C-alpha cells in the first residue's frame, strides 16, 4: 500500500509543479515632446505566462491596457513585484503581439485629476479635479526643473525626460501622503495608486542643488548633482 501511494505521488507531483503561472503588468514610459513637467507618457500591457517553461515568453494572456482608468486599477490590484518596466522596443513588440497592431495607445492624465500627468487638462490655474492629490500635482508641475537637453546649475540633462529638483520630489511625496491620510474609500485607493505609480513604478531621478556660498540665501551660484531619488 505504501509503495502504491509513493508511486501515485511520484506521478502527480511533477504535474503540480510543471506549470508556474506568472502574471505581470508591463509599463513603458516615454517623454512628451516639449513638456516642462516630469510626468511620463505611459503604455501598458498585462501578460500571463508559464515561468518554468523554456518558452516563458509565450503568453497565455496578452492584453493591452486601454485607458488610464484601467491602468490605475491594474496598478492598485497588482503586487509591486509584478509591475515591470518595459523599454520602448519591448512595448512595441507587446503591442504587436497583444493587439495585432503596430500602434498602441498612450495614456496621460490620472483619473479624477487635471494636473497629475504630462501636460494638463486644466483650463486655468484654479481648475482642479475632484481628487485632492491634484493640488499636489499642480504645485509639482510648477517646480524647479531642468528640461531635456537643457543645462542649469552647471548640470546638463542628457535624458529625454524633464528632471526636477529633489526638494520638489520630496515635497510632492509628502503632499500625496498627507492627502492619502485624509482620504477614504475609492479616493484613498486612487491616490495610493498614483503615489505608487510615480515613486515606485516610474521612480524618477532628481537633482540636488548645493550652494557655493553658505550665506547666499537665493543660491544664485548653486551647483547641482544627480540623485537616483530624493531619498538617496
Swiss-Prot record:
GO terms for molecular function: metal ion binding; phospholipase A2 activity. One of its GO terms (biological process) is lipid catabolic process. InterPro entries: PLipase_A2_dom, PLipase_A2_dom_sf, PLipase_A2_His_AS. The keyword Nucleotide-binding does not apply. GO terms for cellular component: extracellular region. Heterodimer composed of a small subunit and a large subunit; disulfid-linked. Gene3D superfamilies: Phospholipase A2 domain. Its main location: secreted. Residues 19-105, 214-217 form a propeptide. Its EC number is 3.1.1.4. Binds 1 Ca(2+) ion. Expressed by the venom gland. This is Phospholipase A2 hemilipin. It is an enzyme of class 3 (hydrolase). The active site is at residue 140. Residues 1-18 form the signal peptide. Glycans are attached at residues 124, 157. Disulfide bonds join 116-137, 136-175, 143-168, 166-206, 211-219. It catalyses: a 1,2-diacyl-sn-glycero-3-phosphocholine + H2O = a 1-acyl-sn-glycero-3-phosphocholine + a fatty acid + H(+). Its cofactor is Ca(2+). Belongs to the phospholipase A2 family. Group III subfamily. The keyword Glycoprotein applies. Scorpion venom phospholipase A2 (PLA2) that shows high hydrolytic activities towards lecithin and acts as an effective blocker of all angiogenesis key steps in vivo and in vitro. It has no effect on apoptosis and does not display hemolytic, inflammatory or neurotoxic effects. PLA2 catalyzes the calcium-dependent hydrolysis of the 2-acyl groups in 3-sn-phosphoglycerides. It is found in: Secreted.
Amino acid at each position: 500500500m505504501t509503495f502504491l501511494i509513493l508511486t501515485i505521488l511520484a506521478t502527480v507531483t511533477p504535474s503540480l509543479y510543471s506549470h508556474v503561472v506568472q502574471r505581470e503588468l508591463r509599463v513603458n514610459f516615454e517623454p512628451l515632446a516639449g513638456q516642462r513637467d516630469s510626468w511620463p507618457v505611459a503604455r501598458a500591457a498585462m501578460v500571463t505566462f508559464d515561468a518554468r517553461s523554456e518558452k516563458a515568453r509565450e503568453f497565455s494572456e496578452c492584453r493591452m491596457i486601454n485607458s488610464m482608468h484601467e491602468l490605475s486599477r491594474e496598478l492598485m490590484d497588482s503586487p509591486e513585484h509584478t509591475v515591470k518596466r518595459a523599454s520602448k522596443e519591448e512595448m512595441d513588440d507587446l503591442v504587436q503581439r497583444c493587439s495585432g497592431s503596430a500602434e498602441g495607445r498612450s495614456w496621460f492624465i490620472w483619473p479624477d485629476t487635471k494636473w497629475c500627468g504630462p501636460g494638463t487638462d486644466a483650463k486655468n490655474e484654479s481648475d482642479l479635479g475632484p481628487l485632492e492629490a491634484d493640488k499636489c500635482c499642480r504645485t509639482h508641475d510648477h517646480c524647479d526643473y531642468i528640461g531635456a537637453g537643457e543645462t542649469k546649475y552647471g548640470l546638463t540633462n542628457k535624458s529625454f525626460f524633464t528632471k526636477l529638483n529633489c526638494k520638489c520630489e520630496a515635497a510632492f511625496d509628502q503632499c500625496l501622503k498627507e492627502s492619502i491620510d485624509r482620504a477614504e474609500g475609492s479616493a484613498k485607493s486612487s491616490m495610493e495608486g498614483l503615489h505608487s505609480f510615480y515613486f515606485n513604478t516610474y521612480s524618477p531621478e532628481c537633482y540636488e542643488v548645493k550652494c557655493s556660498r553658505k550665506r547666499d540665501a537665493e543660491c544664485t551660484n548653486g551647483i547641482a548633482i544627480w540623485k537616483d531619488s530624493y531619498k538617496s
